[in-house]
Amino acid sequence: MEKTLDLDIFMIELNPYIILSKPQLGENIGSTARAMKNFGIKNLLLVQPRDGWPNNVAFAPAAGADDVLNQAKLYDSISEATKTISLLFATTARKRVIGTKSLSIFKAIEKSFEHVVNGGNVGFLFGPEQSGLSNDDVVQADYTVSIPINKEFSSLNISQAVLLICWEWNKIKMSFLKDDKNFVKINKKLKKSTELSNAGDREYFYKQLDELLTKSGFFYSSEMAPVVKRNIRSLFNRASLTHQDLRTLHGIIRSLSGTSNRT
């Protein structure tokens, strides 16, 4: 008797999180949910939606993706929403100069899918419809994602951008699942010493570092302090910090601040 594999078992484990920061229209949240469910992705996180949540106007454009909307999670900040995300991508149409590494959508999906297969959590962050993500938002991500579209008309509805991410993700997932040997790789956890740190742990480190640098007088110019802080974040994010890296950095901070327990 031919053995069949139940792909539904792996849908959650092999899916990313879609994070909408300050979405303005409930209708766009609904159409985003529809785009996600088209490709079996149901992890929707909402950060400060303008019209609040839940929002009944989202259900009509969702066209049946009610389950995605009903299980969507609401957060007060990007840092709160991404606490358990170990690899975060910020989608942006504008070229940034803040130092965050940029990848094409194709490279981003390849890298992110490999990360999920190895037990990590991946998130794709989208900004408000009119303004997009701010520099302070983008600097929280490990990478920015660029989508190759017409430079003379680069306007994408947020649900269209989500659809492209989900489409590319689904292509690589289906290709992966065609090979039975790949099933043994699913949920294979990386060793703790090499696993990428999650955004919540990194955020805690940045706060500790910020406090130490502030006390030392490092931010001598209050006008430039926000820019310098973003640059510092970008510097560390480019290093793809592991849990062990963070433990080492916390040890350095404790030593420099005189709070180390070592004698």
Model-derived segments and spans:
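Post-transcriptional modification and biogenesis factors for structured RNAs
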Residues: 1-263
